[in-house]
Amino acid sequence: TRVSGGDTVWVRPDDAPRRKPVKLRLVGIDAPERCQPWGAEATAALSERVLHRRVEVPTQGVDAHGRVLGGLFLADGSDVAAWMVAQGHAWSPRWQHRPGPYEREQREAQARRLGLFADPAALEPWRFRRAHGPCE
């Protein structure tokens, strides 16, 4: 695995070790962009959690940017996306007026003021992208 952001990793399938790694976008979370405050912390946290570890990747399709969409689970079954939100490294955004899949983890992290939830100026990535565009 290789991490390129707080919600994006490159994974290599076990069944095809010679194949190129696949870019995976974690479903259900949105981490700060690399160029925005908290972006480096989110990327480092995800790296520390998954780098050089065997992971399970249930996929859900491909997004408009060509990234595979899916979950990311460690060998012990723990959900990496849930952990990222619970530790205050990512948001679980609402979708079509429905709560995000990790709403409970986000509420708890906010209540405990963990990570980016301790910063009253922390800006959700979708608002950052709307205001500033993507990182170069």
Give the positions of each predicted feature.
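Small beta-barrel nucleic-acid-binding modules, primarily SNase/OB-fold domains
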Residues: T1-E136
